[in-house]
Amino acid sequence: RMRRLPPVSTRGRSSAASDVDKRLIFAFSSASSVGTLPINLSCTEKLGAKKEVASFVLPLGATINMDGTAIYQCVATIFLATCCGMTLTLGQMVTIVVTATLASIGTAGTPGAGMIMLAMVLQAMNIPVDMIMIIYGVDRLFDMGRTCLNITGDISCALCVTKWESKKTAQTAK
C-alpha cells in the first residue's frame, strides 16, 4: 500500500492552479525559461515557497534544469535515427540519453536553443545533422511545451526545498 504524501503547497488547489495557469501561459507563449523568471518568482512565492529559496532555485533551474529539453532531444534523436533507417541498440539508446541529458544542462533558456544542442547529439550518434530539417518546422510548437515542462520542474523544486528546509529547521529547533 502506497503512503499518501503531504501537500507541498499550503494554499487551496483553485488559487494555486490559477497562479500556475498564469505562468504556464506566459511560458508557453514566450518559449523562454529565463523570460518567465519574474512571473515564476512571484507565483512560486504565492504558492508558499520562501523568497530566499525561490530566488536561488528558480534562476538556477532556468539555467540548468531542462527536463523537457532532455526528453525532447532523446525522442527526436531516436525518431531521426529511425527516419535514416538506423536500428539503435540498447547501448546506443543509453548513449543518447546520457548525451541529451548533458547537452540539455548546457542549453540556454531561450527560444530555439534546444535545436542547436540537438544537432550536437545527432552528430555524436553519427546521424546526419541535415535530418534536423525534418522537425525544424514544428520545433517552435515543441519548444513551447518543453518550456512549460522546464518551469514546472523549477517550481516543484523550489516548493520541495522550502518544505525540506522547514522540516530541517523544525528538527534543529527541537
Language-model segment annotations:
Residues 5-21:
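Short, small-residue-biased leader/transition segments that mark boundaries at the very start
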Residues 7-10, 27, 44, 83, ...:
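Short, flexible active-site loop motifs that bind/organize anionic cofactors or intermediates
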Residues 14, 60, 135-138:
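Hydrophobic core positions of alpha-helical segments in small-molecule transporters
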Residues 23-73, 98-115, 141-157:
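Alpha-helical membrane segments and immediately flanking helix-loop junctions
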